[in-house]
Amino acid sequence: MKVSEFTFDSSTAHNKIFTRLYEPDGEPKAVLQISHGMAEHSALYKPFCEYMAQRGFVVVINDHLGHGRSVTSGALYGHFGEEGGLYNVVEDQRNLQSIMREKYPELPYFLMGHSMGSFIAREFAAAYGNSLTAVVFMGTSAGISTAMWKAERTYLNMLKKAKGARAKIPSLEKIATGPYNKKFKPNRTNYDWVTSKEEEVDRFVNDPLCGFPLTVQGYIDLGTLLYAINTDQWYRRVPKDLPILLISGENDPVGDMGKGVRRVFDKLNKTGHDVKLTLYPRIRHALITEMNSAQVYEDLYAFFSSHLPKAEEPVPEKETEAEPEVSTETEKSVENPAAEEEKETEAAAAEKNDDMPEENAEFPVI
C-alpha cells in the first residue's frame, strides 16, 4: 500500500487542512472518507485505514479545523473559526471529496464519521447524500431537547460575552463530557468512558493532540450542529435511498447507553430510510480501539463490501432460492478480543487557558 500526506485549503480560506491518504496495491474497489471525533486526530485511525487499504479501499482522513496538524501558528485547538462553526468542517469534507473524486471519478464513495465526526457526517449526508454510495454513523447521539439546548446556548453565549469566543474554560469540559465517566466508577482516568481497554485509554490521555477542551465558540458550534441533526428537518433532508449503518456500543454514554442510537434508528426507519443498526453489548465509545475491534473491523468491511457493484460476481448456473432478507437491526456479541494495534502519535501541545467562569451552572451534556 502507498501512504501519503497532503494539505488542501479549508472553506474558511484561512487554514490548510492536513490529510492522510492510504492507497491499496492493485486496482482499488472504492474510496472511504473518514471524519474523526472531537479532541482527537487522524493518526489514531491508522490501523483501521491500513486494514481497509489492504482489502482494496482507498482511505482518506483529514484533521478537522482546530485539531491535529491542521492547527497552525496563531490557531487554537478546539476552535472551528470565528464564523460558520462546524458547517465549515462539513464543507471541508466536501472539498476533500471533490479532490478524491478527481483522482478516482468512477469508484463507489463511502463516508464514515465517529462521535463528533458522525455529527459532521450526518450533516454531510443531508446536504450531499446523493454523492455517497453509503454512510456509517459510528458512536452518534440523539441530541437534547429544544428546551435544554436553549438553556445551554444562553449560558454559553453569556460566557462568550464575558470571556470571549476563543476562551478556554476548564469547567465547560467537565460539564460537557464529565458526566460520561460517572457511569464507570470508580474511575481510573477522566476518559474511562472512551474504551474499556486501559492501554488505549492511556494512549489517549498521554497524546498531546487528544483530550483538549473546545473554546467557548467551539462548544456553541458543537451544540448547534448536534441540535440541527436531530430535528425533523434533518430526517427529511437525508435521501431515503442512501444506505445507512448506525454502529455503537451499548455502554457508550454519547449514545445514551444504546438508547439514543436506537431512537435515531427508529426515526430513520419510520421515515422510510434504508438503515441498519449494530449495537455491541458491554462496549463503550471508541469502537475501533475496543476489546472487540477485530469484529468491528470485519463488520464495517462487510457493510461497505455489500454496497460494491455486483457486476463481477459469477452468474449462477441455475436459479437459486432467494436469501432471507437481512434484518434492519443486528446486535453483535463480544467474544473475541482484538489484538492490540499500535497507533501513531504526533507530538504537539494543545493550548490550555486557566480562565474559570463566574457561573458554574450545570447544563445538559453536549
Label each residue range with its predicted role.
Residues 123-209:
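Alpha/beta-hydrolase-fold enzymes
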Residues 104-115:
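Alpha/beta-hydrolase fold nucleophile elbow
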Residues 36-40, 250:
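Active-site glycine-rich loops that stabilize anionic/oxyanionic intermediates
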Residues 1-24:
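N-terminal cap/lid segment of alpha/beta-hydrolase-fold proteins
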Residues 274-317:
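Catalytic active-site module of serine/aspartate enzymes centered on a nucleophile-bearing elbow/loop
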Residues 246-248:
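Short beta-strand/loop motif that positions the catalytic acidic residue
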Residues 81-101:
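Alpha/beta-hydrolase active-site loop
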Residues 49-74:
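Conserved alpha/beta-hydrolase
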